[in-house]
């Protein structure tokens, strides 16, 4: 029996590895960054609106991959979302950077459209990228303990701490409590987050919640396609931003990005047709996120989260500012120049 159990466990690990991630490690094993990302990834509530032609029957609010249409071209995504070949298999991107005291996990949620349902006095745009960064303290346990969360809602950041946590308001006031919720697909308590329909601003649940139709996404090694706009159990696949062919590696791809951290998007085709107003180049990758009226620079929520955490929160004990793992540092000069020179993008 013991031998069969080990064989079954090995087979499970091999299957998960083939999917790009492995299951969370037992307490005695060293944890990988992929395992950390899976353990802490949010239970995610997505409000869905099916009103009007730009909603695509609700699909404009479905999470998906940046290459949902089979290419890494930013300027065809609005129209390709309406084609029969578009994939809405659920996905979210992640990265992990690390110091001696903390792990910082960023999650990036992508939609092909930031849309509106009426054509007057409103704007929409091609591509939409919002998300969050978690600060997890290395407390000696396998996965650490969640201390803080900062989310991106358009051009504003919102900060949260878990109930009973030790971090408090710093230069920015804490905006609320991040709930921890269970998943039917694993044994962990996950942060609960939510995105609004249409514009997809992201906050802690239930500061945003499902109003009528909506999808509840659960982190996984596989990406499921919602059965409808009112599916309450959809698994989303986690994709490593730092993979060899990942989004970070594509940062200088001019078909996908118009500048460092800003997606290329235009107003051709259906976006901006008639009396709708469609802005161009209006969505950001994590290294382009910018609150605009806080001290940390453009992109630092993802690229220097220790700095941002020290600014946003009052933190007891030690918080190292020296990274032991941070692939963003390879482009430090370019990121600094982008923060100093690029116009602010309002997502």
Q: Locations of the language-model features?
A:
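Secretory targeting and sorting signals
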Residues: 1-29
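Short, positively charged
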Residues: 134
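A domain-level signal for the mature, folded cores of soluble proteins
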Residues: 30-131, 140-347
